[in-house]
């Protein structure tokens, strides 16, 4: 599985190249439209796997308001799933609201995990 750091670097590279950006951006927008998570009230970062130590650390660093908003989005999505209905258009997450609120915390936690692994494997010469 790729780390979020490598995904962010790849995305930055693609966006810095006009030709790649013109090809990839419409495909990405179509993917997001067909994925349908916004119509259930979720943001993209809500879909990331949380069962890793890095993600657990990142989620624990979120501000309280963001944790409450995240939990509310999960409850709303579960209710939509149980009732087999999507949210009305005025309640669905709009593209400008779909921010990457968790990515800075993930990048920080990945950096710390990488540093910890380096320090654990350091060899001291005799």
From Swiss-Prot:
GO terms for biological process: mitochondrial electron transport, ubiquinol to cytochrome c; mitochondrial respiratory chain complex III assembly. It is found in: Mitochondrion inner membrane. Component of the ubiquinol-cytochrome c oxidoreductase (cytochrome b-c1 complex, complex III, CIII), a multisubunit enzyme composed of 3 respiratory subunits cytochrome b, cytochrome c1 and Rieske protein, 2 core protein subunits, and additional low-molecular weight protein subunits. The complex exists as an obligatory dimer and forms supercomplexes (SCs) in the inner mitochondrial membrane with cytochrome c oxidase (complex IV, CIV). One of its GO terms (cellular component) is respiratory chain complex III. SUPFAM superfamilies: 14 kDa protein of cytochrome bc1 complex (Ubiquinol-cytochrome c reductase). GO terms for molecular function: ubiquinol-cytochrome-c reductase activity. Signal peptide: none annotated. Disulfide bonds: none annotated. Pfam families: UCR_14kD. The lineage of its organism: Eukaryota, Fungi, Dikarya, Ascomycota, Saccharomycotina. InterPro entries: QCR7, QCR7_sf. The keyword Transport applies. It is a peripheral membrane protein. Belongs to the UQCRB/QCR7 family. This is Cytochrome b-c1 complex subunit 7. Keywords: Electron transport, Membrane, Mitochondrion, Mitochondrion inner membrane, Respiratory chain, Transport. It comes from the Eukaryota. Component of the ubiquinol-cytochrome c oxidoreductase, a multisubunit transmembrane complex that is part of the mitochondrial electron transport chain which drives oxidative phosphorylation.
């Amino acid at each position: 599985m790729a780390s979020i750091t490598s995904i962010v670097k790849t995305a930055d590279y693609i966006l810095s190249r006009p030709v790649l950006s013109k090809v990839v951006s419409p495909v990405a927008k179509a993917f997001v439209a067909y994925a349908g998570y916004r119509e259930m009230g979720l943001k993209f970062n809500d879909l990331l796997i949380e069962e890793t130590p890095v993600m657990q650390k990142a989620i624990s660093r979120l501000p309280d308001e963001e944790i409450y908003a995240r939990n509310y989005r999960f409850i709303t999505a579960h209710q939509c799933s149980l009732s087999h209905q999507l949210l009305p258009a005025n309640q669905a997450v709009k593209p400008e609201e779909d921010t990457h609120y968790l990515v800075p915390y993930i990048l920080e936690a990945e950096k710390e995990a990488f540093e910890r692994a380096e320090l654990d494997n350091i060899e001291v010469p005799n």
